[in-house]
């Protein structure tokens, strides 16, 4: 059995734990930066632009049927340096809750931070269905030696 290997081309550097890439029609890519606590646009030439500073730990993004960017925010993580990279560890001391945010231009609002009386812990990724509803995952938090697990 043989595997194809891809040739990678680095477009930009210096992102702070990027996740949730969303390709844009203009050739740019939106990424959330968990450690950077923001939504960033990376242009085809590698230039980076901060779209919105969201706080917490933005962890996944999708374009909604209304054209806005919807973000799963895990509420933040502590990071530890391991050699040249930072690795996420546990819930930070300033953690409040996870949330779902809506970004229009450079402005954002928090749509949800709970569901049926339960706080969102760590929303991770989201997707829109054909009728415009969105689904998201919430994988919980690590608090010291304990893990709080959630669901879709």
Regions found by a protein language model. Give the residues of each.
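Sequence-structural signature of mature extracellular/luminal beta-sheet repeat domains
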Residues: 1-149
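Cysteine-cluster motifs in flexible loop/terminal segments that predominantly coordinate metals
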Residues: 152
């Amino acid at each position: 059995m043989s595997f194809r290997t891809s040739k990678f081309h680095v477009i930009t550097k210096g992102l702070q734990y990027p996740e949730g890439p969303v390709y844009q029609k203009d050739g740019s890519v939106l990424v959330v930066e968990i450690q950077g606590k923001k939504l960033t646009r990376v242009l085809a030439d590698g230039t980076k632009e901060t779209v919105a500073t969201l706080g917490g730990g933005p962890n996944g993004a999708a374009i909604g049927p209304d054209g806005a960017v919807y973000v799963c925010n895990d509420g933040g993580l502590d990071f530890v340096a391991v050699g040249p990279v930072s690795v996420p560890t546990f819930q930070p001391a300033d953690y409040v809750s996870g949330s779902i945010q809506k970004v229009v231009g450079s402005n954002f609002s928090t749509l949800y931070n709970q569901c049926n009386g339960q706080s969102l812990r760590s929303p991770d990724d989201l997707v829109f269905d054909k009728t415009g509803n969105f689904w998201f995952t919430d994988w919980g938090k690590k608090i010291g030696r304990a893990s709080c697990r959630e669901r879709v």
